[in-house]
């Protein structure tokens, strides 16, 4: 993380800008039921080494430790999930728990939002959204 003091010309104000590098991957997987698809996702994440992974359309009713481990093999991880509603949907957010600490999780009908604490920075909110492809459900979206 890098902290910089910036003076805004003409305003007489000074602000502190915090710059940090974070790799976030967001992916609509269209289901993670097959081992083959989970292996493709796992291999990709292993090669990219993200800090946060947001997966839409997991099509999973439950995302337990074993399932999450089959997708992302990083040792220090935490996650939050919104289960499927019927045969579609489902959101899973996984993150490196050494870099980000969960402060709050909000599960919406079509979203997962997480407030993270980061060393030396203000809190950060990240959200993953998956909208329904059903016209009757879209009005609730």
Residue ranges and their predicted role:
Residues 1-141:
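Short phosphate/oxyanion-binding micro-motifs
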């Amino acid at each position: 993380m890098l902290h910089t003091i910036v003076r805004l010309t003409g305003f007489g104000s000074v602000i502190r800008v915090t710059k940090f590098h974070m790799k976030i991957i967001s992916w609509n997987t269209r289901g993670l039921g097959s081992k083959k698809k989970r292996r493709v996702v796992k291999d990709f994440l292993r090669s990219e080494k993200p800090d946060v992974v947001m997966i839409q359309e997991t099509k999973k009713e439950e995302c337990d430790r074993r399932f999450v481990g089959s997708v992302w093999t990083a040792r220090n991880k935490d996650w939050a999930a919104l289960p499927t509603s019927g045969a579609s949907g489902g959101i899973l957010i996984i993150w490196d728990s050494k870099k980000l600490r969960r402060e709050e999780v909000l599960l919406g009908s079509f979203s997962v939002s997480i407030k993270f604490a980061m060393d030396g920075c203000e809190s950060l909110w990240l959200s993953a959204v998956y909208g329904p492809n059903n016209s009757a459900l879209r009005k609730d979206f």
